[in-house]
Amino acid sequence: TKQGLEQDAKAVKESVETVGVVESGNLTARITANPRNPQLIELKNVLNRLLDVLQTKVGSDMNAIHKIFEEYKSLDFRNKLDNANGSVEVTTNALGDEIVKMLKQSSDFANHLASESSKLQSAVQNLTSSSNSQAASLEET
C-alpha cells in the first residue's frame, strides 16, 4: 500500500541519517522509525543491535576517544573521558591512570636518587678533605 511504502521510505531515510550521525562519531544514535516491510524491520533491528554492541564495547563518543588518544600520543595524560561506560573508554581511562602512577613513581625515584647522590657527593667531599688533612699531618711529622 501507499502508506506502507511511505512508512518504509521514512525508515530508510532515517537509517541513512543515523549512519551519518554514527560516522560523525556519535555511537548513541539509533533508528527509531518503524518500517512496515518485515525485511526492513529486521534490518533496523540488526543495525540497532550492532550500534548497541559498538556502544558497549567502544563507548558513546568516538571524537572524545580520538581526542584523548591524540593527547596521550603527545604525552599528555591529564585528561580523562567523562562518563566512560564502553570498554574502550573505561580501558583508556585506566591506562591513563596507570601511566600517571608510573610517571609519578619514576619522578619520586629520580628525586630520591638525586637526594642520595647529593648525600654521597657530600660524604666524598668530607672524606677527601679528611684524607688531605691526614696527608698534610703526616707530611709535617
Regions found by a protein language model. Give the residues of each.
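HAMP domain helices
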Residues: T1-T141
